């Protein structure tokens, strides 16, 4: 009986070849995979939502001028990490929606799965490991600067890509920089490398 699984696999492969499929190589691969799973030699792949949560390494470096704005006086700053189904509401919400307690949950609505808050201090290096359930498609980061520069107080990352590459960001006088991580836009589109302007501060003006 020990050879039964292998005879079963061979029979399935032969049947596929005799059937004369249009894409024999792709079909053979699929049939072989199914045959191995049915025979018990390999385990079938779990559905996405049944897989273990993602583990995303997040590295945050704060500047000596953290939250200084135009005043030049560094201050601590609140950072929030949002675990999201979608990025649309996250990017549409105004800055004030994140400042006022409870308004962020209202603004994000059903897109928000969970969030947490961290206090940043100047000239600090933080290395975190974020656990993202499989229902999370994006990880949003907001820093509540006193004088936020443009839209650079928030950024969202693709959860699946972030698990592979990790996320590396910097927090400065009034803006964030990104040196690693797939940044998502409002439509949920992203790329494996952050946009070039996200690693620059030259064109950022602190709001007064």
Go through each PLM region and give its residues:
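Bacterial N-terminal signal peptides that target proteins for export
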Residues: 1-10
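Bacterial Sec signal peptide processing site at the extreme N-terminus
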Residues: 15-43
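Non-catalytic, glycine-rich low-complexity segments
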Residues: 38-59
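A short, structured loop/turn motif at beta-sheet edges
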Residues: 50-52, 131-136, 161-164
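Short amphipathic, basic-aromatic surface patches that mediate peripheral association
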Residues: 58-70
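Short coil-to-beta strand junction motifs in C2/discoidin
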Residues: 71-80
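Mid-length scaffold segments of soluble, non-membrane domains
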Residues: 81-152
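Glycine-rich, aromatic-bearing surface loops/beta-hairpins
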Residues: 155-159, 163-208
């Amino acid at each position: 009986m020990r050879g039964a699984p292998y005879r079963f696999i061979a029979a399935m492969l032969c049947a596929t070849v005799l059937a004369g499929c249009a894409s024999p190589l792709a079909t053979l691969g699929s049939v072989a995979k199914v045959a191995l799973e049915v025979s018990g030699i390999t385990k079938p792949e779990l559905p996405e939502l049944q897989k273990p949560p993602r583990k995303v390494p997040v590295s945050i470096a704060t500047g000596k001028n953290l939250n200084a704005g135009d005043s030049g006086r560094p201050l601590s700053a609140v950072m929030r990490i949002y675990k999201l189904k979608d990025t649309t509401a996250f990017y549409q919400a105004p800055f004030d929606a994140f400042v006022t307690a409870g308004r962020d949950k209202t603004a994000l609505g059903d897109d928000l799965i969970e969030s947490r808050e961290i206090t940043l201090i100047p000239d600090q290096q933080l290395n975190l490991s974020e656990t993202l359930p499989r229902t999370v498609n994006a990880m949003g980061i907001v820093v509540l600067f006193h004088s936020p520069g443009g839209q650079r107080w928030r950024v969202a990352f693709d959860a699946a890509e972030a698990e592979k590459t990790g996320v590396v960001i910097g927090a400065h006088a009034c803006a964030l920089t990104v040196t690693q991580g797939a940044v998502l836009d409002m439509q949920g589109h992203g790329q494996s490398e952050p946009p070039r302007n996200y690693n620059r501060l030259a064109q950022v003006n602190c709001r007064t």
